[in-house]
C-alpha cells in the first residue's frame, strides 16, 4: 500500500516535472536539445561540458537553451550577444542564480554573490576603496613578492631539484593577496599546506571543488530547501573562509586609525563601517571574494603560461630576448632585491608587447574559467533577434566557444602569441568578462601576472623533466587546471 502510494506520487512528480519543461517549448523560445524529466539535459554532458556545449552550438546556434535538471539555462557562444546581455541589457542580467550553493555562507553578501541594488552598493564601496589604494604600495608589494618567488626558484635550480609550478605560483599569489589586503608578509619558508596559509587554502580548495563539480540538488527544485539546510548544518569550509576574514577584521580593528591607510582592509573598514554584524559580514565576504576569485585564477594562468613556454620553446626564447632588449633600452629595472638590469618592472610592460601578447594568447587558447560565474535574469526579456528568455533563467557565457570562433580568430585552434601584436582588442576576447559586473580585480591580476611572468622568463629557461611536451589536457572545474607537472629550471646567464 505505502509502496504503491510512493510510486504513484513519484509518477505524478515525473509528469509534473516533464510538463514544466515541455510547456516552455514554443516558437518564441530559444532552440535546444530535448530535455528528459528530472535530469533535463545533464545526461548529454560529459566531464568536459564546455566542449559539449560548443559542439551543441553547431546545431542550435549562437545562443540556445538546455535544462540542468530543472534550471533553465541559456548558453551564449557569440560575443555580440554576450555584450547585448551583459552590457546593453545589464540590469536584466545583474543577478546570480538563486540556488543553495550561492546563498550558503554569505546570504548574498560581498561582490560575487550579492544581487540587484545590494550588488550595486557593494560595487560602489569596493570600487571606492580600491581607487584609494596607493599604487606605489601595490607596485612595491608585487616587486617584493616577485623577489621571494625568484629567490625560491634560484634555490631549487641550484639544488638540482624540479620546480613545482602549482605549489610555488599559488604561494606567490596567496602571499601577494595577503600583503595587499592585510599588509602581512608570508615567510618564504612557510608551507602552503601548513601554517597561516593553510588556514585559508584548505577550505578554499574545498569551496572550489564544490562549485566546480556542482550538485544535482542545487538545480532540482524539489531538493533545494533540504540541500540548503544540509550545506548550513553539515559543511563548514565556506564558513571557515568567512570566519578567517572576520578574524582579520577584528585584529585590524585593534590598531585601526581612520586617517591611516595601511592596506585594502583598512579602506573596506572605513567604507563599510563595522557597527553591525551585517557590515562585518559584508567586509568578510568581500575579502573572501578577493581570495576565491583572485588567487587560484592568477596562479593557474601563470601555470598554464609556463606549460606553453615549455611546449613552444621558440616563443620562450622570443620573450626572453624581448625582455633583455627592453631592459637594455630602458636602462635596467633597478630597485628591489634583484640586481640592476636584471629585474622587470611594471613600467617595462609597454616595451615588451610580445610578452603581453603571449599572456593574452594563453588566456584565449586555454581559458581559465570555462563559463565564468553564472548570471540570472531578473524578468522576462526579448532579445534583439526576437528570441525570448524567461525570468530566473541561468545565463552562461561559453568562453571556450568564443575563443575558438573562426569569425573572430584566424586559425583559432593554433597557439599563436603574435595574433595580439597587431590588434590590442578583439570582441571575442573577454578573459575577465565584460560589463559592469566584470572582474573587479582584473587590473591587479594583470599586473601580478605580468611582473611574475616576465621576471621568471628573464631568470630561467623552463624545460620538461623528460624532454617531451607537457600534456596540455585540463581538468574541468571552476577553473580549468592542467594536469600537475614538474619543471626543470635552467638559470639564464
From Swiss-Prot:
EC id: 1.14.-.-
Ranges annotated as spanning the membrane: 1-21
A Pfam family recorded for this sequence: p450
Listed CDD domains: CYP1_2-like
Cellular-component GO terms for this entry: membrane
Subcellular location: Membrane
KW Transmembrane (keyword) present: yes
Residues that hold heme according to the record: 439
Membrane topology annotation: Single-pass membrane protein
Name of the protein in question: Probable cytochrome P450 508A2
Source organism of the structure: Dictyostelium discoideum (Social amoeba)
